């Protein structure tokens, strides 16, 4: 089965050393920037990693994303905006919901608010929900 992974679930897979579950699954093109921002915060704001670790992780994430099906949503901003409005979620989050709905696969996220809000449109799961199937 295929899935759409949001940035929270990809980061969680990285932390759990389970990036294997990401291969050949879907995400949106903005994920690269969301993950870069998460890692930047880990170094600059939280001081959990060094600058050398940050650069190494950015390179590793690039290789991970290269194994995923990263889709652009540039043609569908109006539909994404409508989802964001109707579910009262961010445009970023709505892009993942849009993709999951469009290709008819579950959305994998660690965001509890998104799990609840997206349920009317798509099936939502966490990484833990699917980890046993890999």
Question: Where are each of the predicted segments found?
Answer:
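Generic detector of well-ordered alpha-helical packing
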Residues: 7-9, 35, 94, 112
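Amphipathic alpha-helical segments within well-ordered protein domains
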Residues: 36-40, 62, 81-84, 97
């Amino acid at each position: 089965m295929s899935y759409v992974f949001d940035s929270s679930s990809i980061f969680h897979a990285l932390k759990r050393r389970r990036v294997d579950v990401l291969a050949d699954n879907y995400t949106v093109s903005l994920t690269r920037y969301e993950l870069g921002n998460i890692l930047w915060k880990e170094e600059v704001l939280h001081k959990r990693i060094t600058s050398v670790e940050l650069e190494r992780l950015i390179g590793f994430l690039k290789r991970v994303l290269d194994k995923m099906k990263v889709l652009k949503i540039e043609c569908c901003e109006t539909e994404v905006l409508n989802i964001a409005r109707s579910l009262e979620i961010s445009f970023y989050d709505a892009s993942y919901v849009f993709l999951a709905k469009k290709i008819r696969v579950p959305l994998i996220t660690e965001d509890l608010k998104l799990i609840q809000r997206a349920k009317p449109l798509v099936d939502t799961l966490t990484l833990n929900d699917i980890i046993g199937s890999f």
